[in-house]
Amino acid sequence: MMARRDPKSWAKRLVRAQTLQKQRRAPVGPRAPPPDEEDPRLKCKNCGAFGHTARSTRCPMKCWKAALVPATLGKKEGKENLKPWKPRVEANPGPLNKDKGEKEERPRQQDPQRKALLHMFSGKPPEKPLPNGKGSTESSDHLRVASGPMPVHTTSKRPRVDPVLADRSAAEMSGRGSVLASLSPLRKASLSSSSSLGPKERQTGAAADMPQPAVRHQGREPLLVVKPTHSSPEGGCREVPQAASKTHGLLQAARPQAQDKRPAVTSQPCPPAATHSLGLGSNLSFGPGAKRPAQAPIQACLNFPKKPRLGPFQIPESAIQGGELGAPENLQPPPAATELGPSTSPQMGRRTPAQVPSVDRQPPHSTPCLPTAQACTMSHHSAASHDGAQPLRVLFRRLENGRWSSSLLAAPSFHSPEKPGTFLAQSPHVSEKSEAPCVRVPPSVLYEDLQVSSSSEDSDSDLE
């Protein structure tokens, strides 16, 4: 019977029996881990404890029910300072305690020295310390109070202005008030465009048989005041800005050929006035004509380069070209009266941008009034100068109020069959006198006027 048993089945039964025995021996609670699992070098990622890994059944995170709640150990009274003691006073302090005591005594000794110095500088008698300890705070009150006057802070700051420029600007603004009030918008636009160029030249005289244009302005026109002086009879000399301030005219005199390259303004000429009654020492006044031509375009250069200052001996050519709309470049009168027709309009229509109208604004000057005069012969490059006609001459006079006046010195050889009353209102009164000997103005006077006028021109641009 025993031989019939299979040995394999016997072995299987033995293994089963051993496993059952092991299961019976296992405790009901958590099984203690084998010694190989308790390695202090291992750390659990779940609970963060050392000695096991996250796979181990010993981890309390996996078998939380079997984990023991940590119990508190007993209280230790020595840890908490429930009854603080008083600071101990040692009889023999150490070296560190001695340094602390010396530092506390030093500021106490320096306090009376500081008080004595403060009383010396402030000049106040020493105050007795109060028993309640308020003396220390009251003794330093004089440091907070300033002994000198307190500074006054003002928000409005006035700019520093040169007194000379202030006087000039006040006089200019008072003179411009009535003129600017009556200007039309078109006139104000032309005035603002020409203000950067300084006071322009005025037309002081023209040939009797030469046409002069006029422009109709919309609205009111400013009145130009003419003040008669003792140097010109019958009030025939019109006020002209100082010749020294005409730097643009000096530039034109230095470069007469550059005028042909500038843009031109075309206008129809008015009927000329007759000069057959003129002679040596005769006076002529111009007035408005019976007809006015159409409005001519006005060209104003807003940005001009800086004009170089030339010598004081050169008389500006634009002194006779600075009228209300400028005078023509060709001032040489034709020899015959038949050339005054439509053939002269191309020559008279050429104008330069510098001859823009501007209001008569002249700052006051403190230079002495010298009744000097200077005659200048104007050179022309026109075709009419080859016909044997005499050139025009301009006489500049210095008035009493520091201004300059100019008058034409024309020969009596020019005649015209036109009536003398047709050209009476085209320009203010201009006197035309006979040729006189050339009296030279001292160069220093002209150069001084040039410097004064340039400074006034800069002040005008700053004010506007």
Swiss-Prot record:
Residues 180-197 have a biased composition (Low complexity). Residues 74-89, 97-114 have a biased composition (Basic and acidic residues). Pfam families: zf-CCHC_6. Residues 1-42, 70-389, 411-437 are annotated as: Disordered. Belongs to the FAM90 family. This is Protein FAM90A9. It comes from Homo sapiens. The gene is FAM90A9.
